[in-house]
Amino acid sequence: MTKSELIEKLATRQSQLSAKEVESAIKEMLEQMATTLEGGDRIEIRGFGSFSLHYRAPRTGRNPKTGTSVELEGKYVPHFKPGKELRERVDAINS
């Protein structure tokens, strides 16, 4: 599902809100989440999951085109850990 599809689906389900209002709310929520992670803080949405930053240590990588070694710097990357309820709902698909 893309962001546009999410906005469309929510606007349909929440008929009291216009598509523009839903779009604005989604964009603001995503901006707040990005700002929180940018500040090094963790986001927890109970039942859904948590977002945090994980540190990736410096390492030697390879250029896939040439095969030459490339030194990659250490960096923080976003990480999502699903919550118990979300895991159970997804697991139910496999049962």
UniProtKB/Swiss-Prot annotation:
PROSITE patterns: HISTONE_LIKE (PS00045). It comes from the Bacteria. The keyword Magnesium does not apply. GO terms for cellular component: chromosome; cytosol. GO terms for biological process: DNA recombination; regulation of DNA-templated transcription; regulation of translation. GO terms for molecular function: DNA binding; structural constituent of chromatin. Keywords: DNA recombination, DNA-binding, Transcription, Transcription regulation, Translation regulation. Belongs to the bacterial histone-like protein family. PANTHER family: DNA-BINDING PROTEIN HU (PTHR33175), INTEGRATION HOST FACTOR SUBUNIT BETA (PTHR33175:SF5). This protein is one of the two subunits of integration host factor, a specific DNA-binding protein that functions in genetic recombination as well as in transcriptional and translational control. Heterodimer of an alpha and a beta chain. This is Integration host factor subunit beta. It comes from Shewanella loihica (strain ATCC BAA-1088 / PV-4).
